[in-house]
Regions:
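Acidic, polar ligand-binding/catalytic clefts
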Residues: 39, 43, 52-114, 186-191
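Periplasmic-binding protein-like
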Residues: 19-21, 96-103, 179-218, 236-248
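Extracytoplasmic small-molecule ligand-binding "clamshell" domains
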Residues: 4-79, 148, 212-213, 223
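Short, well-ordered beta-strand segments
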Residues: 15-20, 102, 119-122, 167, ...
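A conserved helix-loop-strand patch within extracytoplasmic ligand-binding domains
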Residues: 51, 59, 91-146, 204-206
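A ligand-binding cleft/hinge motif common to bilobed small-molecule-binding domains
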Residues: 62-65, 78-87, 131-134, 158-194
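Ligand-binding cleft/hinge of the Venus flytrap
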Residues: 28-30, 42-51, 128-150, 178-182
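Extended ligand-binding regions for polar small-molecule ligands
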Residues: 39-48, 106-109, 113-127, 175, ...
Length: 248
């Protein structure tokens, strides 16, 4: 019986999903196997669609050329759709995520306006980088310096060591980092923005997989599967599924 299952698994066509390390969405467990919210959601969705999924680590800054060249089929990893709707073909949004600012506990920064003249670190090419660079939102003050770092973990190291006054990222990422490294940062109550998280396919990918994925993820949200997966990783899982008001 088991051998039949394995055979069936290996005969399914493979979807290559590219991501970088972004706990709790996607990371390697103790055995070096990719796991996390996005890995579990993708595995289940593609299984329902008749595919098996191969999760590969990519250079996040090269994600667009990798998906356009066909080296990977799609991109996941807590990937915000906001401002990128024309760059990719999207499945989703399947999760609503808050982009927030975090500071050290003893900081005198309590609201976004307190960031004026301060130094803030972000992971490069992420949504917060654009928010602080472009400053199209009048709530965003002029920083002293915006420091863009290649790896997610580095922004927290910079904050912990006092090289910067604040960091900006997805709330889930900050909460996860504090859990993993026993760090104590304070998250500002006022979010930078609430973004929809999606699965990105190449703009000219007309295989229909993206549309099928979008439908399957929505079915998983409706039938409680997504909630079950998210609650393994995050408290208050329901709030991450409130995607109806995002407007795309």
């Amino acid at each position: 019986k088991n051998t039949d299952n394995t055979k069936e698994e290996t005969e399914r066509p493979v979807i290559t999903l590219g991501s970088d390390n972004y706990p709790p969405y996607i990371y390697l467990n103790e055995d070096g196997v990719p796991t996390g919210i996005d890995v579990e959601l993708a595995t289940e969705a593609f299984k329902r669609m008749g595919y098996q999924v191969d999760v590969v680590q990519i250079n996040w800054e090269k994600k667009k050329e990798l998906v356009e060249s066909g080296e990977i089929d799609c991109i996941m990893g807590c990937f915000s759709m906001e401002g990128r709707l024309d760059d990719y073909r999207w499945a989703g949004p399947y999760i609503a995520s808050r982009q927030v600012v975090a500071v050290n506990e003893n900081s005198d920064i309590y609201k976004l306006s307190d960031l004026e003249g301060k130094n803030l670190a972000v992971q490069s090419t992420t949504k917060p980088e654009g928010i602080f660079l472009n400053r199209t939102d009048e709530r965003i003050p002029k920083l002293g310096n915006l420091i863009s770092l290649g790896h997610r973990e580095l922004i927290y190291t910079f904050l912990g060591k006092g090289y910067v006054d604040a960091v900006a990222a997805h709330e889930e990422s900050i909460v996860q980092y504090m859990k993993d490294y026993d760090a104590s940062f304070r998250i500002l109550e006022e979010p930078l923005m609430i973004t929809g998280i999606g699965v990105a396919f190449a703009k000219d990918d007309d295989r229909g997989i993206c549309e099928q994925m979008s439908q399957t993820l929505e079915e998983m949200r409706q039938d409680g599967t997504s909630l079950k997966i998210i609650e393994k990783y995050l408290d208050d899982p329901q709030k991450y599924l409130e995607v109806d008001d995002l407007g795309y």
